[in-house]
Amino acid sequence: MKKKIHPRYSKITATCSCGNIIEIFSTINHNLNLDICAKCHPFYTGKQRVIDTGGRVERFKKRFKFTKQELN
């Protein structure tokens, strides 16, 4: 087997825009700036919004004039 062909792992810091700092190991040799992390993402903080997909379906049916009889 060849020696020294694997990339070298180094410890870097990933800094989020909310101020959270995460230390990780990576093959890149520079620090990262993140837009969003688990501490500020709406899914993890419980502040997520519900998207109204029912309105889109009704608009599609209206546009193409589908009725319940045609769909069955």
Swiss-Prot record:
It holds the Pfam family Ribosomal_L31. Its cofactor is Zn(2+). Zn(2+) binds at residues 16, 18, 37, 40. GO terms for molecular function: metal ion binding; rRNA binding; structural constituent of ribosome. GO terms for biological process: translation. Binds 1 zinc ion per subunit. InterPro entries: Ribosomal_bL28/bL31-like_sf, Ribosomal_bL31, Ribosomal_bL31_A, Ribosomal_bL31_sf. It comes from the Bacteria. GO terms for cellular component: ribonucleoprotein complex; ribosome. Keywords: Metal-binding, Ribonucleoprotein, Ribosomal protein, RNA-binding, rRNA-binding, Zinc. Part of the 50S ribosomal subunit. NCBIfam families: L31 (TIGR00105), PRK00019.1 (NF000612). Belongs to the bacterial ribosomal protein bL31 family. Type A subfamily. Binds the 23S rRNA. This is Large ribosomal subunit protein bL31. It comes from Buchnera aphidicola subsp. Acyrthosiphon pisum (strain APS). The gene is rpmE.
